[in-house]
Amino acid sequence: MRIFNPFGRNTSRTIQFITGLGKQTRRSHNKSFTIDNIATILGGRNIGDEYFIADPELDFYDLDVLAVGPVAPEVSGSFDQFWNHELSYPVSSLAEQVPIPEESKEIKAKFDEFISDQQQTEYIKSLKNSEFAQVFRSGTQEFIWGPGKIVADDPQKLTTDIDDKTYHLSEELGPYLNEVNNELLIFSPYFIPGKAGLAYFKKLRERGVSVTVLTNSLASTDVPIVHSGYANYRRQLLRMGVKLYELNSQLNKEMKKGKFYESKSSLHAKAMVIDRSIVFIGSLNLDPRSVVQNTEIGIVINSKEIADKFAMYFDKKVDSIAYRLELRIDQDGFEHIVWHGSGDVEDRTLYWEPHTSFWERFSMGFLRLMPAESQL
């Protein structure tokens, strides 16, 4: 195991975070799972209970793609770049104390016992008996075939100036985004378009392109300060005619059927659908930190069948999982954002952030004043 761009051991993490902002906080945000250079899974999912419906407090809604063929060794090649990079350190070189053999045996025994106990839980039994697991074990899983292209940041991105785009994934995605003709669907848990993004969306809207964004609400986000950065752009986006949807953090019991907890829901999927013919799925959020600071990876799939299914599923489900935002002007000429719930979401209109307290809204208003957008 290796750790990419870790904090140093001779200075406290807090001091490094404060004094090294823009360097020590830059990280590998890539997510991939590749087996024998044959198959690879890409998306936004981390390894943790909350990403697999196993956390009683938080339930991340994520998206993955399983790909086979030439793209698998491409992902392995990207992984090797990071593994062999000068910023990657073996865990043993960072450990303050290496366990002695007896301790290692004890730790392994406890781990094996834990794994054995988990096999009898309702959660594991449900996974093993799920429809997907049964189909996969039987070898009858059907694939949709189409050309795919891996787009990934080079680890050198973290060693060069942030204005140097040579190693940026965005340079590979740019041509696809510049060729949008009719519709752009965006799924991004953290969405901060910035001035460049606003200019891009404005051009699309002037050409009559439909732009729809699904992101987190204040109640569903796990990083309120990032939501504050997004909130600064909502009115401008709505004025342009961009359709904004924010995930409902309290999906009703019908939506949660089959899950083990009534946990808070949060969007974690990162994807784009272009003209219902091209799909991007990966680790990239549309915010400054992902685009400029961190490294990311994803796949561009040129398949009308996949893109159309994806978009149709969104059309069918969005009103039952998210609030639609609207910009209203009152009788005094002041603009107000309202949140509409329909379908399975509460059928009502709200004039404040759904499922939030006064203190949460007040805190978010304060965070919006902080000049830290480049780090969000």
What is the meaning of each model-derived region?
Residues M1-K31, I35-L376:
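Charged, low-complexity intrinsically disordered terminal segments
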